[in-house]
């Protein structure tokens, strides 16, 4: 960890207490909540904005970029609107992702059996094309992938960020 201190003893300390032949495992109750963070600066094309994560909890797990798209006619809008995303801790760059890498990662790692891709027509958004193609719930979440050149109003989309601590709760980043 770059940021290390007395507050993360529950995460980094020895989680076992041994008395003779019995092992008692220590655990801490927790809950998960989505907390919206705001950007510093104005969001526009080719602009750089930053968001400071507030200390409203103990850990950071999943992160999403929320965007109101309006009417678009560009495939994979969410990933294509991102040039790069940088994670800095204490002014030191820890991780950096590019929009085209995020698109490739989503295509390679999201299988149908995971339940991420919607299977019913009720959970799909039509692209407006006559060829019967649909933008699935995952494609909507991962930035409207597969949308044809026809203009579509997807409303709010959520682009999942793929930092190491977003992959499972055991890797969550302590605040």
Per-range role (PLM):
Residues 1-175:
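Short, low-complexity Pro/Thr/Gly
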């Amino acid at each position: 960890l770059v940021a290390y201190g007395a507050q993360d003893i529950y995460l980094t300390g020895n989680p076992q207490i041994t008395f003779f032949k019995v092992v008692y495992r220590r655990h801490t109750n927790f809950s998960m909540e989505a907390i919206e963070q705001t950007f510093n600066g104005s969001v526009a094309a080719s602009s750089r904005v930053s968001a400071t994560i507030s200390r409203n909890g103990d850990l950071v797990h999943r992160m999403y970029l929320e965007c109101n798209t309006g009417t678009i006619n560009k495939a994979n809008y969410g990933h294509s609107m991102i040039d790069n995303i940088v994670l800095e801790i204490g002014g030191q760059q820890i991780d950096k992702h590019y929009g085209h890498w995020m698109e490739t990662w989503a295509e390679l790692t999201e299988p149908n059996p995971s339940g991420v891709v919607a299977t019913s027509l009720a959970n799909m958004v039509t692209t407006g094309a006559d060829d019967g193609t649909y933008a699935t719930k995952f494609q909507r979440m991962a930035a409207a992938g597969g949308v044809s050149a026809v203009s579509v109003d997807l409303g709010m989309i959520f682009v999942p960020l793929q930092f190491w601590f977003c992959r499972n709760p055991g890797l969550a980043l302590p605040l």
